[in-house]
């Protein structure tokens, strides 16, 4: 377990080098949930995390390369879930989650472990989420997102869907499930004497303009990553149980081209900057989560570690560059160097 923690934590810090400022993403900030509700979500997350750790240990006993793969996936989830993407149609920024691709590749329980490590580092060093609300964030992004993506992917594959189509829908619904669960957590925790259902619908409606297009973008991104892995390293996907050894391929090439075109189109629309360079693009955490909480008397508290002071952020960036080099090398070896060895033996 010590080794997986080092792999996952070290690799996850890579994403810090991509952030020039506070992360504009969706997490429930420190202090927003009352103590009782925060404790409840910790209790919900705990058994999934325990089962996930046991699953990692079981799989790594049979495959020594599994823990490095978990570390690499932790870096992927960390980077994706910190990457602010502007949405011109909503005037806000948000982020994909990455749990759909993680659940497809390593399973939902292991994805919960990966998500917990990523969220913990974000809460400690990037003022992204909070320690008291870590349980709620793990449940929404780690549990709901991972299991939604995994069940949808497996179900669609059994119904005969192609690899690209199944991965697309899995990534899409994993993203939306995360935000639906966040709406559930926030409306339950801050409503006071207000009826639950109207507040829940209000929060969901506030998420829709941003997360509707971003969910489609994450679906296309998930499909692209799975298809790329299948074309470069089908043996890896077979070993992880994503595809059957010697089974059908990634599906019609037309579906792959459509997914890629959709990804490029949405990406170009989403990252199109505002006409005024000085215009600010607040994150969904500000426009939805913190705004709704403030309306109900819950204000976010300052993070435990303030990276805006001193040289801590510079240290994180330098460390990220070092770890990023090792992770990039491992990813290259997995996709290219080991692929050549695989081809030589087939």
UniProtKB/Swiss-Prot annotation:
Subcellular localization, as worded in the UniProt entry: Cell inner membrane
One GO biological process term: cobalamin biosynthetic process
UniProtKB keywords: Cell inner membrane, Cell membrane, Cobalamin biosynthesis, Cobalt, Cobalt transport, Ion transport, Membrane, Signal, Transmembrane, Transmembrane helix, Transport
InterPro entries membership: CbiM, CbiM/NikMN
Annotated pathway: Cofactor biosynthesis; adenosylcobalamin biosynthesis
Main function: Part of the energy-coupling factor (ECF) transporter complex CbiMNOQ involved in cobalt import.
GO cellular component terms, semicolon-separated: ATP-binding cassette (ABC) transporter complex
Cross-referenced HAMAP family: CbiM
Major subcellular location class: membrane
Signal peptide limits: 1-25
Similarity annotation: Belongs to the CbiM family.
Quaternary structure (record): Forms an energy-coupling factor (ECF) transporter complex composed of an ATP-binding protein (A component, CbiO), a transmembrane protein (T component, CbiQ) and 2 possible substrate-capture proteins (S components, CbiM and CbiN) of unknown stoichimetry.
Bilayer topology term: Multi-pass membrane protein
Gene: cbiM
GO molecular function, one term: cobalt ion transmembrane transporter activity
Protein's recorded name: Cobalt transport protein CbiM
Organism of derivation: Geobacter sulfurreducens (strain ATCC 51573 / DSM 12127 / PCA)
Regions that span the bilayer: 31-51, 68-88, 101-121, 133-153, 159-179, 196-216, 255-275, 312-332
């Amino acid at each position: 377990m010590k080794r997986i923690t080092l792999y996952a934590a070290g690799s996850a810090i890579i994403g810090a080098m991509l952030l020039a400022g506070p992360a504009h993403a969706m997490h429930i900030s420190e202090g927003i949930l009352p103590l009782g509700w925060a404790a409840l979500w910790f209790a919900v997350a705990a058994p999934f995390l325990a089962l996930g750790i046991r699953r990692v240990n079981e799989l790594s006993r049979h495959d020594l390369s599994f823990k490095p793969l978990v570390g690499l996936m932790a870096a992927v989830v960390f980077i994706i879930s910190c990457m602010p993407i502007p949405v011109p149609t909503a005037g806000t920024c948000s982020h994909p989650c990455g749990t759909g691709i993680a659940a497809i590749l390593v399973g939902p329980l292991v994805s919960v472990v990966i998500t917990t490590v990523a969220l913990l580092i974000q809460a400690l060093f990037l003022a992204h989420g909070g320690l008291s609300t870590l349980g709620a964030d793990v449940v929404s992004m780690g549990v709901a997102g991972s299991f939604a993506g995994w069940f949808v992917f497996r179900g669609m594959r059994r119904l005969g869907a192609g690899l690209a189509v199944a991965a697309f829908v899995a990534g899409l619904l994993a993203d939306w499930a995360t935000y639906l669960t966040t709406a559930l957590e926030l409306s339950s925790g801050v409503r006071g004497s207000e009826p639950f259902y109207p507040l829940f619908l209000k929060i969901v409606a506030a998420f829709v303009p941003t997360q509707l297009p971003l969910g489609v973008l994450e679906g296309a991104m998930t499909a692209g990553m799975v298809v790329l892995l299948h074309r470069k390293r089908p043996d890896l996907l077979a070993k992880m149980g994503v595809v059957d050894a010697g089974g059908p391929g990634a599906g019609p090439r037309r579906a792959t081209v459509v997914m890629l075109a959709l990804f490029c189109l949405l990406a170009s629309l989403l990252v199109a900057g505002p006409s005024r360079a000085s215009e600010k693009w607040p994150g969904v955490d500000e426009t939805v989560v913190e705004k709704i909480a403030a309306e109900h008397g819950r204000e976010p508290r300052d993070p435990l570690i303030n990276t805006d002071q001193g040289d801590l952020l510079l240290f994180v960036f330098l460390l990220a560059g070092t770890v990023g080099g090792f992770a990039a090398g491992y990813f290259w070896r997995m996709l290219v160097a080991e692929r050549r060895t695989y081809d030589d033996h087939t």
